[in-house]
Amino acid sequence: MLKFSMEFCYPQPDVKTLIVGTLGPKETSSEQTLNYLITQWQAEQISVTSHLFDTFTELKEALLQDRVDLALVPHAYERVNDFYMEPSLKLGFVFTYPTPIYGLAKRKNEELVWENCTLVTHPAPFPLLPYLLPGYPHQKNIKVEFVNSTSAAAIQVKQGLADLAITNENALKENDLEFIAEYGKIEMSWSIFHKKGTVHRE
């Protein structure tokens, strides 16, 4: 059986505090994973401040400008190579952690009108659409728009800017929506990046 292990690389020796960034707004899959990491760091007596960014591009710039110590990025991000290929950045850790349940959501207590329906989604879970809405390829009356996160998609539906969203269960609850179809959790792999420099290994 194939096995390998990797030690987490801190950006500085004897670290006691960390500023960690990932994709927002509140209740993204990335934030859920960051909250899991925070519990692990707190168990090691490390104080963590989290920052949520509108895009991973903004997160990368914040890391390069030393506004965060670490950047948490899912491998589903279509431009994750921007982090790997940045000469100033170093991979600190790779791990797996599941997302919340994903599904297709609408506003509660509202009948869905399919004619000229607008569906919003982050690009990463867009391939789930044929599973969530089996007749989608043949429905010409659905307009698809891309947004920066699953949480942003849920917010747009709540605000009446869209009719449907591919979103996660946390964002669904936060924005008082309901699923009309569920896919389940995604077994996601994640990378943590920091700027190159002196690194401490546990």
Swiss-Prot record:
Keyword Lyase found: yes
A GO molecular-function descriptor: lyase activity
EC number(s) from the headed UniProt entry: 4.1.1.100
Assigned keywords, A-Z: Lyase
Source taxon at top rank: Bacteria
EC category: lyase
Record's catalysed reaction(s): prephenate + H(+) = 3-[(4R)-4-hydroxycyclohexa-1,5-dien-1-yl]-2-oxopropanoate + CO2
Reported consequences of knocking out the gene: Cells lacking this gene are unable to produce aeruginoside 126A and B.
Assigned protein family: Belongs to the prephenate decarboxylase family.
Summary of the function given for this chain in its UniProt record: In vivo, involved in the biosynthesis of 2-carboxy-6-hydroxyoctahydroindole (Choi) present in the nonribosomal glycopeptides aeruginoside 126A and B. AerD is an unusual prephenate decarboxylase that avoids the typical aromatization of the cyclohexadienol ring of prephenate.
Protein name: Prephenate decarboxylase
Native source organism of the sequence: Planktothrix agardhii (strain NIVA-CYA 126/8)
Lineage: Bacteria, Bacillati, Cyanobacteriota, Cyanophyceae, Oscillatoriophycideae
